[in-house]
Amino acid sequence: MDQLDQLSDYFPPPLPVGQTLFDWGKRTYVMGILNTTPDSFSDGGEFNSLPTAIHQAKTMVQGGAHIIDIGGQSTRPGAETVSLKEELERTIPIIQALRQELDIPISIDTTRAEVARQALQAGADMVNDISGATFEPEILAVAAQHKAPIILMHIRGNPQTMQNLTDYGDLIGEMRQFFSAQVDLARHYGVLPEQIILDPGIGFAKTAEQNITLLRQLPELKRLGFPLLVGPSRKSFIGKILDQPDPKERVWGTGATCCRAIAGGADIVRVHDVEAMAQICKVADALWR
């Protein structure tokens, strides 16, 4: 029996993060994306100065965001890795400034333990690791030390190689195995089960068809007993369905995807277009919760 089978009947208790209590199952929480990068796939270069980043964060809060997710390293397919120094310079000043002005939970989107450590010291509340702690497992020790929730995403390879690693015999079964190993590792490092959130990793080492399959079978991952974060925002599989090459024109396709995710048990949706998605989530919650 693997780690997750042992926890299959575990229902996550409410999670306090800063001044917010996340009461799982009662509503969908909206995570607003704040990329401070010049090369993110849909908003690169728009918010990589302190004034524009702060303005965008406040706009997202006014639009209904419950979490602001700050990232200084693009994770689009083929993205090059920036230096540790550059990633810190892109994120830490913004976290420090936002912490002075907003009470909302702040998430640091990073795969590096040192970035996570400095971000949490600067005022971030949680860690969002798109590698699921496979790049730098010591990031789990940082989260445990700070008693910070951590989001573990499913991926194969890295942003340079992941789209060549989409050959699955059993997509959901292999994702379960991945999460089993990473949850076990997180607990080994001292992360409490109630501080773990899982992300199936839409668009990461998955084809368009596999992303659709994943969304259809999301309840199978919900059965693992952990809160689920789903990040479909403006992704290329939506563009393929809509024949829409411009990521910013995929808003309503993103909305439809969020509805499917919520019906399948998603607890958090990670999105660019916060105001529109917050309204969609409210209606979806009224229908399915």
From Swiss-Prot:
GO terms for molecular function: dihydropteroate synthase activity; metal ion binding. Mg(2+) binds at residue 35. Keywords: Folate biosynthesis, Magnesium, Metal-binding, Transferase. It holds the Pfam family Pterin_bind. It catalyses: (7,8-dihydropterin-6-yl)methyl diphosphate + 4-aminobenzoate = 7,8-dihydropteroate + diphosphate. Gene3D superfamilies: Dihydropteroate synthase-like (3.20.20.20). This is Dihydropteroate synthase. It comes from Synechocystis sp. (strain ATCC 27184 / PCC 6803 / Kazusa). The lineage of its organism: Bacteria, Bacillati, Cyanobacteriota, Cyanophyceae, Synechococcales.
